Amino acid sequence: MSVEHPPIGEANTEPAAGGCPVTGRLRHPLQGGGNHEWWPNQLNLKVLAKNPAEGNPLGDFDYKAAFNSLDLAAVKADIAEVLTTSQDWWPADFGNYGPLMIRMAWHSAGTYRSSDGRGGANTGQQRFAPLNSWPDNGNLDKARRLLWPVKKKYGQNISWADLMILAGNVALETMGFKTFGFAGGRVDVWEPEEDVYWGPEAEWLGDKRYSGERDLENPLAAVQMGLIYVNPEGPNGNPDPLAAAVDIKDTFGRMGMTVEETVALIAGGHTFGKTHGAGDAALVGAEPEAAPLEQMGLGWKSSHGTGKGADAITSGLEVVWTTKPTQWSNDFFEILFGYEWELTKSPAGANQWVAKDAQPIIPDPFDPAKKRLPTMLTTDLSLRVDPEMEVISRRFKDNPDEFADAFARAWFKLTHRDLGPVTRYLGPEVPSEVQLWQDPIPAVDHELVDAADIAALKEQILASELSISQLVKTAWAAASSFRGSDYRGGANGGRIRLQPQLGWEVNEPDELARVIAVLEGIQEQFNAAQTGNKKVSFADLVVLGGVAAVEQAARNAGVAVEVPFTPGRADTTQELTDPEGFAVLEPKADGFRNYLGKANPLPAEYLLVDKANLLTLTAPEMTVLVGGLRVLNANYQRSPLGVLTETPESLTNDFFVNLLDMGVVWEPSPADDGTYVGKDAATGAQKWTGSRVDLLFGSNSVLRSLAEVYATDDAKPKFVQDFVAAWNKVMNLDRFDLA
């Protein structure tokens, strides 16, 4: 529903050009003002300093141990008690908060988008802005307050992130549905995630994210600002079920859901509960972030009647889908296909549909003596009018057990999508069946290599035809596919030699294939020579190759260093790898390799910071890695851009020394290709070339201050030490067994 909300705040998208670039009075820093108001396009490096230890009230807390100490059955029993204990301050529809908890869990997980892995339930972000105040999350603040007694009782043994998802599962189970399972392991954070791009709009329900016919901007999935998925009234409130079907399939597809999973989720979720649109939405007050202090973090206070219970207003729609809203059934499909539908308005004026020639068979949420006519949303009718979804819907209607299984699996996928591989799952209800979307890696079934083996393998790798550059690039390509947003990717599994990673442009497929062949030969030779069960995996060998190369490059620079290496990675197979599912991990840019693909929405330096953010790097770690990778000659296609050294493949601090050299003047390349030329200030002779990413470390004041640390005459040992530490961090980002 198109409810008016205060604007988020107009964004100044114009670059600062001389003089003060702002108008009006600047805000106090405590009000959100600061440098960004003067220079709105300033690179935001704060995304590389997320969730600092100083902001964590728990300190060095072992959540895994705490969660595993829980009596999960007792927690679930306490949640179940909450569900059927109606509170006067927010009465339960049909005497059961189960549907409200399902919506809370759904919307916690449903912000996930597969394109960058951001969003989702993993850190409990629904507690914070902007999500706690999105129009689509209206009155979910009440759901979390209802759960407070449970959270209070069990304290830090269960995170809010886990509790919200568990409450959704308990709601389903207590209403007669058999879930697929539940895994804990979501760790709370203590601040909003401000590195997530939710869209360009500066007002609720705006849709500037579209271009062309209806092309949705990447990486977004939702159709409008402040919605989790689609507009239930139809595109921009237009009650066209067929047009809404296009949005549904696009949006759910961008979450990583198939069309069958999408149908199952919509129908399964809408088997329970109701929507709320009892009256004029203009009577609803401000969202939590804009509400007055005395409301204590609760928003959407309504002056329509009592403002709650039978008078509640949330979406503005007033729909009850089934005859048994607190019981699992096949009613949704029976009713969807059992009637013809005509457009009507809710009491709040929202577009919805009512059954023609129907009897009032739908229960009232608060008066058992009353019955209602069957009603549906525009997006519900999409499941009937869209040819592809109709076939699935009719099959589910005629095969209730198949529908129940599909919903159970889709719900589990929805609520666990950003939790990472099964090795991160906690608790007694983790299902034994592994799903393809979990990126399965077989368990290590052999003895691991020891220190002597590692030393011998490093010698053999360095004696091969492979260069330091090739070894570094291959290890980086494998490990840097990791995303800290949803814990996907990384070197474990050895997927660098499988499709689609083997064919990614940034990985230089032809050269990569040659490197893989050599490493596989070394692996086969080593494994064949063993008499017992000792083996080296290909995944371990890729990382070990990088380790050997970095150590040799340091020796070339006159520094002896031992790069840490812990074996234990396993090799997966092409059959256990979904090429379409992995395609979203392909880098469109990688500033660490000076790679910039085509049609990127932001300049290369912004994309570098985004990549560093996904790799969970700090600004110093990003800085030292870029400088080190440049002198290791690890650029895409061995480009000379930023290779500011006369001795490539030596781990020197030359990149920083030469970048900050005042005897070099930089200017845009005459090729007008976005690159730069560094010339001798005295002679005008060309000395170097560089990219926007390279020059960033001399231009940006914060990054220049970091570059200066590594450019001093006494910096070489520290540079090598810090590079090795950052390199080792990236190589082990997906080693959850080491945590």
Swiss-Prot record:
<feature type="site" description="Transition state stabilizer">
    <location>
        <position position="103"/>
    </location>
</feature>
<feature type="region of interest" description="Disordered">
    <location>
        <begin position="113"/>
        <end position="134"/>
    </location>
</feature>
<feature type="binding site" description="axial binding residue">
    <location>
        <position position="270"/>
    </location>
    <ligand>
        <name>heme b</name>
    </ligand>
</feature>
<feature type="cross-link" description="Tryptophyl-tyrosyl-methioninium (Trp-Tyr) (with M-255)">
    <location>
        <begin position="106"/>
        <end position="229"/>
    </location>
</feature>
<dbReference type="GO" id="GO:0004096">
    <property type="term" value="F:catalase activity"/>
</dbReference>
<feature type="region of interest" description="Disordered">
    <location>
        <begin position="1"/>
        <end position="33"/>
    </location>
</feature>
<feature type="cross-link" description="Tryptophyl-tyrosyl-methioninium (Tyr-Met) (with W-106)">
    <location>
        <begin position="229"/>
        <end position="255"/>
    </location>
</feature>
<dbReference type="InterPro" id="IPR010255">
    <property type="entry name" value="Haem_peroxidase_sf"/>
</dbReference>
<dbReference type="InterPro" id="IPR019794">
    <property type="entry name" value="Peroxidases_AS"/>
</dbReference>
<dbReference type="InterPro" id="IPR002016">
    <property type="entry name" value="Haem_peroxidase"/>
</dbReference>
<dbReference type="Pfam" id="PF00141">
    <property type="entry name" value="peroxidase"/>
</dbReference>
<keyword id="KW-0376">Hydrogen peroxide</keyword>
<keyword id="KW-0479">Metal-binding</keyword>
<keyword id="KW-0408">Iron</keyword>
<dbReference type="GO" id="GO:0005829">
    <property type="term" value="C:cytosol"/>
</dbReference>
<feature type="active site" description="Proton acceptor">
    <location>
        <position position="107"/>
    </location>
</feature>
<dbReference type="GO" id="GO:0046872">
    <property type="term" value="F:metal ion binding"/>
</dbReference>
<dbReference type="InterPro" id="IPR000763">
    <property type="entry name" value="Catalase_peroxidase"/>
</dbReference>
<dbReference type="InterPro" id="IPR019793">
    <property type="entry name" value="Peroxidases_heam-ligand_BS"/>
</dbReference>
<dbReference type="GO" id="GO:0070301">
    <property type="term" value="P:cellular response to hydrogen peroxide"/>
</dbReference>
<dbReference type="GO" id="GO:0020037">
    <property type="term" value="F:heme binding"/>
</dbReference>
<comment type="similarity">
    <text>Belongs to the peroxidase family. Peroxidase/catalase subfamily.</text>
</comment>
<keyword id="KW-0560">Oxidoreductase</keyword>
<keyword id="KW-0349">Heme</keyword>
<comment type="subunit">
    <text>Homodimer or homotetramer.</text>
</comment>
<keyword id="KW-0575">Peroxidase</keyword>
<protein>
    <recommendedName>
        <fullName>Catalase-peroxidase</fullName>
        <ecNumber>1.11.1.21</ecNumber>
    </recommendedName>
</protein>
<comment type="function">
    <text>Bifunctional enzyme with both catalase and broad-spectrum peroxidase activity.</text>
</comment>
<dbReference type="GO" id="GO:0042744">
    <property type="term" value="P:hydrogen peroxide catabolic process"/>
</dbReference>
